[in-house]
Amino acid sequence: MQDIPLIYWIPKMHKNPIGSRFIAGSKKCSIKLLSKYFSKALKLILNHMKLYANTVYERSNLNYFWIIENSLDFMDKIKNKSIEHMETYDFSTLYTALPHPEIKRNFSKIFQKVYNREGKQFINVNLRQASFSSEGKNNCCSFRVTDMMEILEFVLDNIFVRYGRKIYKQVVGIPIGLDSGQDIANLLLFSYESEYVEKVSKQDLFLARKFNLCSRYIDDLFVGGFPNFKDHIYKIYPRDLEIKLESNNIKEVSYLDLKIRSEEGRLDFSVYDKRDDFSFEIVNFPFIESCIHKKSALGVFYSQLIRYARICSKCEAFKAKAHGLVNRLKRQGFKLEDLRKKERNLS
């Protein structure tokens, strides 16, 4: 029983009313290692799909791959684009609403496609990497296409969580905390998105290219230059998923850790932290008198300045964010002269 993930609750204090997030703590779960290896194999498959989608984009100017790695990846994608209209959406029930039969059906097609394109029988996985291979190896786990489907079905059919003295089986969705959970969600949404763009392109190429400025980071979706996107949401994704429009201003949106403003089509970027909007104070940087070494604590300041510099389009935005950070760290015991020494390293 100790090997069954323990479910615990985290409040979303910034929501009104206060929201909930349930996590399955699977650190000691009996399928932990299998799920970890499966996660690496899924990432390899997703990378194959990314490379394939890049080729499609180069040849036909169609965006099959909306997934981004981080905010810098997203900025590289859109910073030189002229965008007058922006929207952001949130998949509020992504993990809890994914239908198991839908996952199995879509993944069966994806696995077959990828293995056939690669022309290799195996995905060899160890703790460091995963790769396609013509033969299995003794020092790693070797997965055929049939093995991948068996693992997927086993993982989905054996999701149990422990709550107090009771054990529950999850029959819809996947738990947050499962190693391969994020990869399963990402790959499933990718299958919906790519299939829809491909389908539309055969009927209306101009409309299909309207999706070129769509980007998604797991359950956060950005849509640029496509005012009618909302008409397509439930043609792309199943209605089991609850998808909410987050933005209320087409000229200024917050996405990931970015605030994006459209000024006559040109994009202006600055740093956004949703925790700044909380009605209560939080501690997200170390105190100088904590157990953290002084050098490491000052390194946090330096790394944040680099992040601000990479994101901010205008010097004024960088200065405002840096000034706020300095004031916060001073309240937490940092000396101004130490911060200034670190700041000089940027020049």
Where are these regions (language model features)?
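Non-catalytic, regulatory and substrate/membrane-recognition segments associated with hydrolase enzymes
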Residues: 1-85, 92-93, 108-112
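Alpha-helical structural motif
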Residues: 6, 30, 34, 38, ...
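Short, compositionally biased low-complexity segments
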Residues: 5-17, 79-83, 123, 157-164, ...
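Short helix/loop capping segments that flank catalytic or ligand/cofactor-binding pockets
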Residues: 18-21, 32-34, 46-47, 96-99, ...
